């Protein structure tokens, strides 16, 4: 049974219908992981007692274990210990898993970006009457965002690709649909190649967006 190019072309629009689920999952994961990572990064930067040690433990665990294992622990394991989690749906579990996993990586990128900002800028902000919170929000974080943007965009791209693991929880996204189509037609190569092409296309578009965003942010610093 040779390669069926026409079958792959017919499959592409079918799979694209599930791209919305994939992107929604990744977008919610990005939003929540950014919020959590900024909190973790600030805890690490200011070395808050107890919280700093807990954040280090959190980051170490989620960076040191596979995402698939984390998803299984979250969806299949925790409900056995915490009964209130029994009703959690697969989509929500996948979003939570992606959030917890990638926040650990993003937190370190944001922390490094904040530390990379000249200390004198914080001192100058405080000297004109700003509080530490105001200085972080108005002066430090905007500059840190420019520094951290490339790595954060790369993590978002990784997150989109990692949504393919959500089918193991039963989420009906691109990979799940491709698996179903491949199983019914026995055209596994064509089905998974179609998936690869869709992910590749999304990544190419996001890479262009990243280049544009970096140029936009760097424009203010070009003399």
Swiss-Prot record:
Transmembrane segments: 23-43, 59-78, 90-110, 156-176, 186-206
InterPro entries cross-referenced by the UniProt entry: AA_ABC_transptr_permease_3TM, ArtM/GltK/GlnP/TcyL/YhdX-like, MetI-like, MetI-like_sf
SUPFAM superfamilies reported for this sequence: MetI-like
Pfam families for the chain: BPD_transp_1
GO cellular component: ATP-binding cassette (ABC) transporter complex
Swiss-Prot/TrEMBL keywords: Amino-acid transport, Cell inner membrane, Cell membrane, Membrane, Transmembrane, Transmembrane helix, Transport
Domain ABC transmembrane type-1: 19-210
Subcellular location: Cell inner membrane
Keyword Transport appears in the UniProt entry: yes
PROSITE patterns per UniProt: ABC_TM1
GO MF terms held by the record: L-cystine transmembrane transporter activity
Protein family membership: Belongs to the binding-protein-dependent transport system permease family. HisMQ subfamily.
NCBIfam families xrefs: HEQRo_perm_3TM (TIGR01726)
Job of this protein: Probably part of a binding-protein-dependent transport system for an amino acid. Probably responsible for the translocation of the substrate across the membrane.
Name under which the protein is recorded: Probable amino-acid ABC transporter permease protein PatM
GN (gene name): patM
């Amino acid at each position: 049974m040779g390669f069926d190019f026409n079958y792959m072309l017919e499959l592409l629009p079918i799979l694209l219908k599930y791209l919305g689920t994939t992107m929604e999952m990744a977008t919610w994961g990005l939003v929540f992981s950014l919020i959590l990572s900024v909190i973790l990064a600030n805890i690490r930067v200011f070395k808050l007692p107890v919280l700093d040690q807990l954040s280090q433990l959190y980051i170490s665990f989620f960076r040191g274990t596979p995402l698939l294992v984390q998803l299984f622990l979250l969806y299949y394991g925790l409900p056995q210990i915490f009964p209130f989690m029994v009703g959690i749906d697969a989509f929500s579990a996948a979003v939570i898993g992606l959030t917890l996993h990638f926040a650990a990586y993003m937190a370190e990128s944001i922390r490094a970006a904040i530390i990379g900002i000249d200390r004198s800028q914080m001192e100058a902000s405080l000297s004109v009457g700003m509080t530490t919170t105001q200085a972080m929000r108005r002066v430090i974080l905007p500059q840190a965002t420019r520094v951290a943007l490339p790595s954060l965009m790369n993590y978002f791209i990784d997150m989109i690709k990692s949504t393919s693991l959500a089918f193991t929880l039963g989420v009906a996204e691109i990979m799940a649909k491709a698996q179903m189509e491949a199983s019914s037609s026995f055209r596994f190569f064509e089905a998974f190649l179609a998936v690869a092409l869709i992910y590749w296309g999304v990544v190419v578009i996001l890479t262009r967006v990243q280049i544009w965003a970096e140029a936009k942010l760097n424009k203010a610093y070009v003399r």
